[in-house]
Amino acid sequence: MEKLIDDEYKVTIIGNLIRDERKAQKKSASVIASLSGISQQFLSELERGKKSLPYSTVHSVFNVLNIHFDPDIELIRRADDLINNIINAYMNFDRDSMLSSLELLICNSYRYSYAYDYYQTAILLKDIFIKKVDKPVFIRHFKNPKLEMLNLICLEKTDSKNTMFYITQGLSYHSSTHTQPSYCGLYCILLFDLAEYHEKNNDLLKALSAYKEVIQAASANYFRRFSLSAELAYAITYSKLGDISLSQEYLERIISIAQPDDDIEKQIIYAAVINSATNFLIMGDYNKCQATAISLFNENISETNHNFVCYQLAFSNYMLGNTDKALNYCRHYKLSDNDRSFPADFIRMLISLKSDTPNEQMLIDLFSTALLNGDSSDVEVSFKLLTDVLKKNKDFAKAVEYYDKYIQYRFSKRI
């Protein structure tokens, strides 16, 4: 028993190390490896003594492995085998051990849900509910609204035909619990999904109402990540409804955050900057659009966001008459192997910049996108630009190839 207490102390120390590493935004692989060695000693004690670990020790192990607010799925899975070993060991012992194993199984399902792996969460929950049904002694112990709520979310995520049923059931059954911090995250997830459902059905006012509820619930319980995400969605929805000034008010509130807590909050702020620049573009304030978008041009952002920024900078410069700058930002637009297409406005802008002829690959992408979009004037002009460059480069084989595509397009339009 002294050995177990000693190991429990080590686990607490390691838990603090992991939390420190997370604050520094480092991977905790080495610390997980250290914990693994200690936990193997726990398992050996279990096998030798045929008895469960002290309840406090169980929670020390779990609290270290539990990666609630770290969406690093790789790290979660590395810890997974260890938790499953503990669960399997418990199942061979007395009732208290089985209760502990089920509790770890429940906690494991929460870990997966926080990493948005709802399929894996659903599998774990199914296992939990089967065990609960088979062993009536567990029913009272695990009559847990939070667990039921998580189950409804998983059903909603994996059964697209009955989405609204599960959302409504979850919100109505647990609407009185959202003021408690332990329920707030799940309550907000259901509200986000409700808003998304209304948006898909073009009911933007109902979507706004759902986002507003998220903001209120998350703010009351200091769930800043949820409240920021909801404020961003709220602002974007107002922009879709045409209320740009109110949209900007919410976006500027997000952008003003000086020190985001983590990388996810940073990405939310980046998204707010991009949407703010888009609003200025819609209003025709090209100087403000340019000044807003340029702040992200050299940031480490996703390819999709990078392309948004390039488009905003190119278009605002184009509208201000800075054609050289516009073309330069066009060339920074990244086309992936799977998607070599430009937005329609981008095509027209590039076409109008024909005096500063873009490179051959850009013109090929431009013509290909025009064919996909089917706008005849875009096709005609982009085809002429492309063939002029191919002839100039004496690349007659490629010129014939694209001439053939052009003829096929013209023939299909006649039909």
Q: Which stretches of residues belong to each language-model region?
A:
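DNA major-groove recognition helix of helix-turn-helix/homeodomain DNA-binding modules
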Residues: P54-D72
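Tandem amphipathic alpha-helical repeat scaffolds
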Residues: L82-M91, Y118-K131, E148-F165, L186-N201, ...
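Amphipathic alpha-helical segments of tetratricopeptide repeats
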Residues: L102-S109, I139-F142, Q169-T179, K212-F223, ...
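Short alpha-helical DNA-recognition segment
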Residues: K26-E45
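TPR/TPR-like (Sel1-like) alpha-helical repeat modules
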Residues: K391, F396-K413
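Structural signature of alpha-solenoid helical repeat junctions
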Residues: R111-Y118, K143-L150, T179-L186, F226, ...
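A short, Lys/Arg-rich alpha-helix, primarily the initiator
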Residues: M1-A24
